[in-house]
Amino acid sequence: MKQYNVGVIGATGMVGQRFITLLENHPWFHLAAVAASARSAGKTYEEAVGNRWLMKTPMPECAKKLVVLDAAKVEEVAAKVDFVFCAVNMKKDEIKALEEAYAKAECPVVSNNSAHRFTPDVPMVVPEINADHIEIIPAQRKRLGTKRGFVAVKSNCSLQSYVPALHPLRGYGITDVLVCTYQAISGAGKTFETFPDILDNVIPYIGGEEEKSEQEPLKLWGHIEDDKIVSADAPRFTAQCLRVPVSDGHMGAVFVRFANKPSKEEILKAWKEFRGPAQDLDLPSAPKQFLHYFEENDRPQPKLDRMLENGMAVSIGRLREDNQYDYKFVCLYNKTMSGAAGGAVLLAELLAAKGYFD
């Protein structure tokens, strides 16, 4: 695989910092540019971040001396890279405009932002689940009038614990899903130092999260038709999302009903044997085993299991029959790894493997 020069837009924020750490020594991607707001532009990355480095590992040497570019100067950034990752904190309309500006400058965008998730010709991809949705990109390029440029996005972090667990079971006709998510403070871009209100507390509301948790799975399970992605009609989802005092690792408590109820053994077999396109293509960031089931009654736990397979796997446990639904179980994944930057890097690896950056 050839090496691609990569930029990170929003490089000084928490997810941007995670991108920087993941790109260190990446076999396919070389960090060539960092961009942020105008107030950071002109400083070295080390100066711009200052004492706001939030990762547990030291700032990579490859990033420290890079001069931060102004993210709004699209042509300047685009000229230095083959594609960009985008993780900015702006209004949704501003994000849409910025990402399309990069795409129209013939610089593909792999986005961690939510702004384009329901743009009909923008693929929202979890590589193990709906890798085929990247085939919409030629239609998007036609709309944008580009030859190389496009926007591709990853899904919301909340659903990346439970949708992968449900995906191998779709053959049994999932009709109804109730999910309660327990989401770490990393999902708000916070640490315990910057979010003291969460200590000894649970906040029972995360703005917009429940709607995303109910609607986005249906786009992931949709299909391409007439130059757009058409969402699936089923199953019916209902969700509640809570912020909990955990540094990293989102959990889901899932209740599921089937048209053709499988046995517990069939469910466990489906999870154990599941492989997605990311595994078949042997992408560098892909976990060898995407879904892991724990037999112990008290697993999975964020503290013990969030870094399973370098934080890119989904952990599942406590599968039981239910007296109102058919089954219930719990699941866990690492928000800042598979849920945010890591998921976007994996998507970029898929796009590279399929030739979309060439």
Regions from the language model: what does each represent?
Residues M1-P204, P235-R236, L308, V314-S315, ...:
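N-terminal Rossmann-like NAD(P) cofactor-binding subdomain of oxidoreductases
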Residues S186-D358:
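Charged docking surfaces used in two-component/phosphorelay signaling
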